[in-house]
Structures are given as C-alpha cells and as structure tokens.
C-alpha cells in the first residue's frame, strides 16, 4: 500500500472517531437545551472541564502507550508490544477506579471548585454523580480507540465510536425527552454509550484479530516505572493540549457566573461546541499519524516518517483554510 493511501486510511477514520467523541457532548447539550432547560445546559457546561480532564488522562495513557507499542511493532517485537498493551490497560483500569472513588468522596468540593453557585449546584451534582460512576469507561474506551489503530484496524475505531454515538443519541431522546430525566438522563446515556464502546473494543482485542492481545505479564517495579515514564513522556504534549481546553472552559465558566449569570453559560456552551468540533479535527490528524510515525520510527524508515509529517502539515493547512472560510462566511447561519 502506498504511503498516501496509508496516510488517509489512518487519518480519516481518526478524524471521524474524534468527531464522534465530540458529538457526545454536543448531543447531550442539544437534548438538554431543548427538552430540559437553560439552567440544565449551564450545569452540564460547568462539568465539561472535568470531562476534559478525564479525556486528558485517557490521552496521556493511550497516546503514550500507542507510541511505545508502535515502535516495538516496527522493530518486530510483538511479545514486548503485547506486554506493554496488557500492562497499560490494567494500569488505566486501576487508576481510573481510584480516580472515580476520589471523585465520589470529594464530589461537593469538585463541583464548588468548578464554579457552580447555589443555582447550579444540585443540577451539576446530578450530572457529575452519574459521569463519575462511568468515568473508568470514558478513559478505557478512549485508550482502546487509540490502541486499536496501532493494531492495524482504524475502521474498528470508527465502528466502536459510531455505535456508541448512535446509542447515545437514542438514549438521550428516551431518557431526556420521554422519561424527563434531565441532566441525569444525559449523563446516563453518555455513560452507557461509553460502556458499549469499551465492550466493542474489548471483544476485538479478546479475539486477537491483529497484533495486539492480552497476555500474562510479570513485571518488576523497575519495568513498571520505565514504561510509565515513557508513556508520560510520549503522551505529555497531547495531555497538555486537552488540559488547556479544560482550563479555558473552566476560566470562562467562572467569569460568566461571576460577572453575568448562569443563564449565559448556555450561550457559551454553543460556541464551545463549535470550537470543540474544530479542535477534534486536528486531534484526529495527530492521532491518525501517530501509529504510522511510531511504526516507521521503530523500523528505522526515516524517509517515510518525514513524508508523513509533511503530508500532515499540508492536510492540516488545507482543513484550517476551509474551516476559517466556513466560520467567516457562515457565522450568522
């Protein structure tokens, strides 16, 4: 397969998958705004930075381990790649459960820190309490989606993401519109969708269709530290990018609540959804090229890595121009 075909085989599914992950939040916002109310949408917006934080954790572990695994596969070290894969999934599972337990214990403090006032506190609590329960699936599903691409199955990433998205839309309609469950319904719909996504990806890896599969591992403390350190180093840039998004939304939320009123958060939510869609496109390009770059780095094919980077810059530039034109000429629409 030519390098151009490989590039688009991985990048296009990654962009679509990232769009789908963005749609989770947008769909929740749409149904909450139309069938619950403005205050409910504002409560969802308050919790968005926490959801971004969950994705940041998923990114640093998923992208970091994807790079390590890609390099090992490029070198032909399949056993080592499977060892890293199994270890990182077990680590994510344990870490995300601990994170969820801490969030449950400090739920009220987290909500106040996020900026919820007395008007939004209970609504934000209703939404976050459900999100926290499903948070391990948020992190694992995203990590699985990244790792299934380095396994050579970018289309499976789309299948998992789209299946979950469709489920989310259907459940949002049923739980928010039909059962009038408000923000709890929105959070429950998204949580179940993330669980479904996890299940689809788990079945793929359990079936051992590609290079990666779960194996029995025995690692020393030195090995654990070594792989965690490399994971953090490789995934840190993407982690900071996602954390910046969370910080940006968090600061805007605080200013709007302090100097305007909670109702204005619903208007900001719409703007945030549009910017989320744009940033997801660029993240999709990044995540799509990473498996190729790490593989060719491992196989020491530097010329191919350089060509992929060049194609990425050109592709991102073209997409940026198109998006700017749409935003400029279609702002009123």
What is the meaning of each model-derived region?
Residues 41-101, 138-157, 267-331:
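Small-residue-rich hydrophobic transmembrane alpha-helices
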Residues 98-129, 322-333:
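Short membrane-interface helical motifs at transmembrane helix boundaries
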Residues 1-11, 190, 199-245:
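Interhelical loop/hinge segments that connect adjacent transmembrane helices in multipass membrane
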Residues 165-199, 331:
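Membrane-interface helix-loop junctions in multi-pass transport and translocation proteins
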Residues 5-66, 233-257:
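Signature of the first transmembrane helix
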Residues 118-141, 276:
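Alpha-helical transmembrane segments of multi-pass membrane proteins
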Residues 23-42, 111-118, 174-181, 246-277, ...:
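Helix-terminus/linker motif at the lipid-water interface of multi-pass membrane proteins
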């Amino acid at each position: 397969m030519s390098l151009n075909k490989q590039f688009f085989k991985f990048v296009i599914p990654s962009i679509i998958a990232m769009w789908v992950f963005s749609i989770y939040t947008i769909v929740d916002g749409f149904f909450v705004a139309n069938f619950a109310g403005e205050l409910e949408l504002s409560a969802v917006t308050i919790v968005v930075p926490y959801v971004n934080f969950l994705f940041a954790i998923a990114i640093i572990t998923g992208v970091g381990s994807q790079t390590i695994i890609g390099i090992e596969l490029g070198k032909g070290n399949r056993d080592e790649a499977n060892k890293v894969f199994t270890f990182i999934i077990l680590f994510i599972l344990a870490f995300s459960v601990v994170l969820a337990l801490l969030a449950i214990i400090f739920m009220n403090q987290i909500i106040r820190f996020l900026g919820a006032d007395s008007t939004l506190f209970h609504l934000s609590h209703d939404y976050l309490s459900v999100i926290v329960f499903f948070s391990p699936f948020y992190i694992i599903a995203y990590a699985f989606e990244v790792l299934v691409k380095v396994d050579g199955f970018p289309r499976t990433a789309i299948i998992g993401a789209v299946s979950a998205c469709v489920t989310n839309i259907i459940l949002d309609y049923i739980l928010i519109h039909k059962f009038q469950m408000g923000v709890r319904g929105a959070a429950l719909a998204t949580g179940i969708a993330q669980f479904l996504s996890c299940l689809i990806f788990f079945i793929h890896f359990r079936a051992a269709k590609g290079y990666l599969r779960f194996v029995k591992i025995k690692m020393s403390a030195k090995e654990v530290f070594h792989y965690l350190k490399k994971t953090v180093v490789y995934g840190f840039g993407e982690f900071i990018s996602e954390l910046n998004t969370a910080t940006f939304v968090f600061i805007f939320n605080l200013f709007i609540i302090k100097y305007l009123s909670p109702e204005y958060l619903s208007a900001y939510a719409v703007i945030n959804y549009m910017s989320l869609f744009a940033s997801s496109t660029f993240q999709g390009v990044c995540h799509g090229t990473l498996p190729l770059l790490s593989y060719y780095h491992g196989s020491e094919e530097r010329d191919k890595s350089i060509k992929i980077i060049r194609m990425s810059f050109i592709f991102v530039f073209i997409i940026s121009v198109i998006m700017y034109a749409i935003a400029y000429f279609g702002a009123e629409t």
